[in-house]
């Protein structure tokens, strides 16, 4: 670029005319984009790990993840046919069949859903771009590793412009942000999850406790010492093991304990809390093997439809709609899950293996 007269006399060039300086990362730097793909730095949040330890929550998550992970993605345009907008399916971009070069779509989409389900948001980092500037490959960023400085949550109002990964700032233009229409379950009902965890802990303690089947009570005579009572109980147990009939004198009475296994394991409380967790996870309770009283006939196809409509669809639409945004695909190009194959029954592994009666059923 030709210098002006002032620049020639001063012997220097104005900074505005100089190309921007690109600062190289210091040797051994870490965090931010430098940590993407370094899986030894990845982790899941403790609140998520606590919630997944609840059996109903785990079952709900696995049911929905199995649907999200096993459905194919397809790409289409829309065209006006004179009456309505018609979908015209097109050849997909290469990344649609393998979103991340390092893992399968089944794995990545299932764990992308996992972040949406538990936290209400999920992230993919753009690791390469095609010649037209659009993303060509991605890598998942675990939600627990990402910090949103401008929107700490738990409710997110839009994409964040201040994302930090492993302590360093990320260029938000290289991050695809999935925002769930449903708040993450670890934020929705913390007390319900805490109650379920305490209930499981109580059941575990009771399962480890030895409660006698009965009590020998002295009703008369000279009071017996602790040693004598222990010897009498041991002799009584030995006699019961070797004889069908036990004998007691008029000064000793045998009284059965009223504690039963269902009371010890808090079965009624467990059933109620399982129902609460099914409500929290937004799936019909019968899909998690929970008894719901009166029933009407439910076929396997109707069960798949219930799982899709009440549980999976909101998350599937969130993922597909985010992939259809203009920072991922050109305007007018869209992505959707092939839900028809699932609803028509070509994907039946998960539902056919469910442990439920043949006349299983939804609440009437």
Stretches found by the model and what they are:
Residues 250-255, 295, 340-345:
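Short proline/glycine- and acidic-rich turn/helix-capping motifs at secondary-structure junctions
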Residues 304-340:
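Long, compositionally biased
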Residues 245-247, 285-296, 325-329:
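Short acidic alpha-helical/loop segments enriched in Asp/Glu that coordinate divalent cations
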Residues 115, 296-297:
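Short Asp/Glu-rich motifs
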Residues 264, 273-282, 316-319:
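Internal mixed-charge
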Residues 2-266, 270-272, 276, 348-364:
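Structured, contiguous alpha/beta core segments that scaffold functional sites
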């Amino acid at each position: 670029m030709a210098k002006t007269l002032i620049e020639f006399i001063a012997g220097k060039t104005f900074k505005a005319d100089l190309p921007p300086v690109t600062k190289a990362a210091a040797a051994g730097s870490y965090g931010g984009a430098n940590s993407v793909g370094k899986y030894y730095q990845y982790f899941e949040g403790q609140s998520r790990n606590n919630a997944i330890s609840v059996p109903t929550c785990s079952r709900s998550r696995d049911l929905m993840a199995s649907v999200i992970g096993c459905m194919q993605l397809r790409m289409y345009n829309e065209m006006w046919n004179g009456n309505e907008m018609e979908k015209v399916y097109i050849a997909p971009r290469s990344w649609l069949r393998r979103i991340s070069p390092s893992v399968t779509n089944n794995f990545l989409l299932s764990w992308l859903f996992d972040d949406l389900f538990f936290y209400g948001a999920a992230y993919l980092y753009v690791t390469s771009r095609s010649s037209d500037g659009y993303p060509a490959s991605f890598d998942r960023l675990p939600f627990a590793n990402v910090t949103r400085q401008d929107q700490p949550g738990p409710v997110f109002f839009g994409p964040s412009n201040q994302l930090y990964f492993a302590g360093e700032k990320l260029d938000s233009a290289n991050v695809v942000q999935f925002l769930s229409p449903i708040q993450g379950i670890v934020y929705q009902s913390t007390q319900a999850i805490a109650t379920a965890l305490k209930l499981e802990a109580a059941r575990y303690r009771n399962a480890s406790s030895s409660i006698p089947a009965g009590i020998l009570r002295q009703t008369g005579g000279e009071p017996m010492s602790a040693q004598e009572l222990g010897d009498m109980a041991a002799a009584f147990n030995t006699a019961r093991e070797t004889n069908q009939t036990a004998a007691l004198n008029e000064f000793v009475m045998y009284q059965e304990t009223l504690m039963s296994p269902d009371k010890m394991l808090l079965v009624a409380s467990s059933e109620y809390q399982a129902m609460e967790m099914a409500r929290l996870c937004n799936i019909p309770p019968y899909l998690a093997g929970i008894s719901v009283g009166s029933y009407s006939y439910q076929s396997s196809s109707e069960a798949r439809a219930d799982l899709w409509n009440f549980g999976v669809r909101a998350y599937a639409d969130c993922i597909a709609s985010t992939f259809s945004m203009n920072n991922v695909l050109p305007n007018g190009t869209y992505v959707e899950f092939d839900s028809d194959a699932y609803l028509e029954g070509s994907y039946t592994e998960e539902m056919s293996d469910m442990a439920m009666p043949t006349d299983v059923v939804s609440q009437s």
